[in-house]
Amino acid sequence: MNFHVFDTYVKANDGHTIHFDVITDKNDSTTAISFAKEWLKSIGENNLVVTTEECKFCHSESVPEDTEIEIMTNGYFIVQMEGCPKKLI
């Protein structure tokens, strides 16, 4: 099964750039933007501007099984790239 990757760059509340990918089974920008905002809120970055300018469809790909399970459970998976908070263990 192919999943859809939305490349996302947003300005954080402190001004630095947060770069991450939203991976979902829906090839829909509105849904990807909603997932991006949900994840940003979960890391304490509220009310950031996220539009189709910041969250753009990039490509479709297959994903590892654990990623697919998370997508099927939560609707999406975030691949943290640059400027993202350190993952808590």
Which positions does each model-derived feature cover?
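Short, charged/polar N-terminal "headpieces" of proteins
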Residues: M1-I18
